[in-house]
């Protein structure tokens, strides 16, 4: 008789590194997550974990046949019955008759990726108007790509007044920031150009959302506070659907998809890891950076999409590795620069076959969310007209 495994009291999804910075302010999330979409995300552990050892390769293959799953020497763990990783492919959070438009303009900074335009195609599919900042030598290619991918209706190309400067994407991001101020915006979104999809986390499911509403929810939540200067969604691959998470985490870094207040005094700088750097400077002022778990981004893996930083920075510093398609040394300078800029909280570590930075966010646990004056919130749930379409026809997939 197999009994359900007992839960270790010390186990918590909040203990893992991706949510470092979890503090009392996050433990009180239910006091803040009001007049927001319904959010239920509880731990849903396996019934039982069984560790198995096989005496021979033949025994291993016989076992694979008996359970009807493919097992190789690289297989570390499996679910039984077999986990259906495609079960949510045709599920989408869509709008029921009304779409909430964005309050703040959205920018993509892109270089040398007119042949993919991953983020722009995703936003256009969701019918979200946005800007793409490109360098002069790329303008013609990007303009042609708007017709190739049939996204011209939703895209405005902005030609940056510089090219091939080699000092990182910060210059283009600052230029987009200035552009947003020039059109009267009080905040702006700035996105990497390799974000394929965006997701809502609810009821232990990561399901794509298919309109601007998910971004609007994040905007509305952030706009309640006087001291949240940077916010954005968590990476999908850092959220395990069967673990417990709060809908947001305060006092941590935001990557790749950032909502930034235009009155933030800190601008982009540095050639590498500029996302973490700007967030650390904001938090060192006693202000808050807020990362959403309730809404997530699906990012292509670092250095796997040609163009952009992959060509200009990581591989350029170790050209021999370009022949192999991936440069394991490409992130060492990126990590070291952050450690040099923030030696009080950042160090360089080797993990998962490549160099990473490690940041201690504990010093920022004292940074509390502060409501703006005259904020009056309704109690209860506001689902923003989102409904679950169980048979969404995505042109990228076929049944």
Task: List PLM regions with ranges.
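Compositionally biased, non-globular sequence tracts
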Residues: 1-98
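Short, solvent-exposed loop/turn segments at secondary-structure junctions
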Residues: 57-59, 113-114, 194-196, 236-239, ...
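Short, aromatic/basic amphipathic alpha-helical patches
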Residues: 63-69, 119-124, 141-151, 246, ...
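C-terminal catalytic/acceptor-binding lobe
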Residues: 98-105, 114-115, 270, 276-399
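Short, well-formed alpha-helical segments that are part of the catalytic scaffolds
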Residues: 102-130, 134, 138-146
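A structural signal for short, well-ordered beta-strand segments and their strand-loop junctions
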Residues: 132, 187-191, 229-234, 289-293, ...
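Active-site-proximal specificity loops/subdomain of glycosyltransferases
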Residues: 134-191, 196-210
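Conserved catalytic core of nucleotide-sugar-dependent glycosyltransferases
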Residues: 197-281, 309
